[in-house]
């Protein structure tokens, strides 16, 4: 499905973004490993988290959904999973296939994991190597590069592992395998990635010690606690509307009850450094995470800056929309140390370079990032989403500041994380 975007005169209103995708995945997976009944409210009913929910059902977990869309997971404990009688399809979800690999690495049965056309070309060596070191028998296609992957779990041992890249998915896979391992599991990242897994496992009674970029998980000799959680709303989804408010003249948007985990909010820090007007208030706690309301409004003078180093993992999902913001900033914006973006749902560095060039942007591509010279007058044209939800939404925000009409090809990929995106965008223009 294609979507035509027209230039917006203003964006005004109040929105509630969808529930957090990362926490939705983890809630349904971790509840499946706990002993007892867990209740999950405000789950993200989108394709990616549903891949995780259906995967756990395939492994024998009893999951029911109430009329009010609350999920009830009857967990039978760490060692209660059963071998699936079929290949488990993880859809488009890298989170599902990587976290699930860590879980089934500790099971004494065979599991085969695959996904859609995009997922079958996502790199898997980054989890296959450490899980193999822990004792799992695990193989992937094309010399362990890609899915499908076959895992014969068994007796695991804890390892001390230096991660070559900062990745919450890889970190989580190893920590989940560590739940089944004999001995301590220690991980060190080059930069700190999002920490939802550590927070949630701690709340379930797992002994986890965090020291800067190092996480240490002690052997688990008891069942994990079940839990009730109301999932906060997704910062990465809110980011598109934060950017829209900053870029479209005479705009004001209030975004309600957003997850403000410090490992996720680098985008706000960068936008403020560029001169954006953004306020955060009504901060409380929900689901073990800080949440609050975000108010963003038009920013008349943005300036280009350098974005690199420790902040990159804190805005890794916001790279596409940050590129769009940079097109309207005075001077050069340079984004570096983001090579892992080449292995997301699409090659996001290549995709944003290609599509923004079509819209008239001065953009240079590096191996690990981009340089954008602004401000640029964007020209509406036909652009391609690469079937990547974050590319589609970023280009849609580019469309609302471009002259003429912008056509987003394969725009329905937004259903992966944010099915209501276009209806909210239209509502803010009325």
Curated annotation (Swiss-Prot):
Q: What is its EC number?
A: 2.5.1.19
GO cellular component entries: cytoplasm
The UniProt entry's GO biological process terms, in alphabetical order, are: amino acid biosynthetic process; aromatic amino acid family biosynthetic process; chorismate biosynthetic process
Where is this gene product found? Answer: Cytoplasm
What does UniProt list as catalytic? 317
Reaction catalyzed: 3-phosphoshikimate + phosphoenolpyruvate = 5-O-(1-carboxyvinyl)-3-phosphoshikimate + phosphate
Q: Which residues bind phosphoenolpyruvate?
A: 21, 94, 122, 169, 348, 390
Q: Which Gene3D superfamilies match?
A: Enolpyruvate transferase domain (3.65.10.10)
Q: Cross-referenced PROSITE patterns, in alphabetical order?
A: EPSP_SYNTHASE_1, EPSP_SYNTHASE_2
Instruction: Output this protein's name.
Output: 3-phosphoshikimate 1-carboxyvinyltransferase
């Amino acid at each position: 499905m294609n979507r035509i975007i027209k230039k917006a005169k203003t964006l005004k209103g109040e929105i509630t973004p969808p529930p957090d995708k990362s926490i939705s995945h983890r809630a349904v997976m971790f509840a499946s490993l706990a002993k007892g009944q867990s209740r999950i409210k405000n789950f993200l009913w989108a394709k990616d988290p549903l891949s995780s929910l259906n995967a756990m059902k395939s492994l024998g977990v009893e999951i029911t959904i109430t009329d009010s869309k609350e999920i009830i997971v009857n967990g039978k404990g760490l060692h209660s999973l059963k071998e699936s009688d079929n290949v488990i399809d993880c859809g488009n979800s890298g989170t599902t296939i990587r976290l699930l690999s860590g879980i089934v690495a500790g099971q004494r049965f065979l599991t085969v994991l695959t996904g859609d056309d995009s997922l079958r070309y996502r790199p898997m060596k980054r989890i296959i190597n450490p899980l193999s070191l822990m004792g799992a028998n695990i193989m992937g296609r094309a010399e362990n590069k890609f899915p499908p992957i076959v895992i014969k779990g068994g007796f695991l041992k804890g390892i001390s592992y230096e991660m070559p890249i900062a990745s919450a998915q890889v970190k989580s896979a190893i920590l989940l395998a560590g739940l089944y391992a004999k001995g301590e599991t220690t991980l060190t990242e080059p930069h700190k990635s999002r920490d939802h897994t550590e927070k949630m496992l701690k709340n379930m009674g797992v002994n986890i010690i965090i020291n800067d970029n190092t996480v240490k998980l002690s052997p688990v000799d008891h069942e994990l606690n079940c839990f009730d959680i109301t999932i906060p709303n997704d910062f990465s989804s809110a980011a598109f509307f934060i950017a829209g408010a900053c870029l479209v003249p005479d705009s004001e948007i209030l975004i309600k009850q957003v997850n403000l985990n410090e490992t996720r909010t680098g985008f706000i820090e960068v936008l403020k450094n560029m001169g954006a007007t953004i306020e955060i208030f009504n901060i409380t706690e929900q689901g073990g995470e800080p949440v609050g309301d975000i108010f963003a409004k038009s920013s008349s003078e943005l300036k280009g800056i350098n974005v690199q180093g420790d902040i990159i993992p804190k805005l890794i999902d916001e790279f596409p929309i940050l590129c769009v913001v940079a097109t309207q900033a005075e001077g050069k914006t340079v984004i570096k140390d983001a090579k892992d973006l080449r292995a997301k749902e699409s090659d996001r560095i290549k995709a944003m370079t290609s599509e923004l060039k079509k819209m008239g942007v001065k953009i240079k591509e590096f191996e690990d990032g981009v340089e954008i010279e602004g401000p640029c007058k964007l020209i509406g044209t036909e652009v391609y989403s690469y079937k990547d939800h974050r590319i589609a939404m970023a280009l849609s925000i580019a469309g609302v500041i471009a002259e003429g009409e912008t056509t987003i090809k394969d725009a329905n990929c937004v259903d992966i994380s944010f099915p209501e995106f276009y209806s909210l965008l239209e509502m803010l223009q009325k």
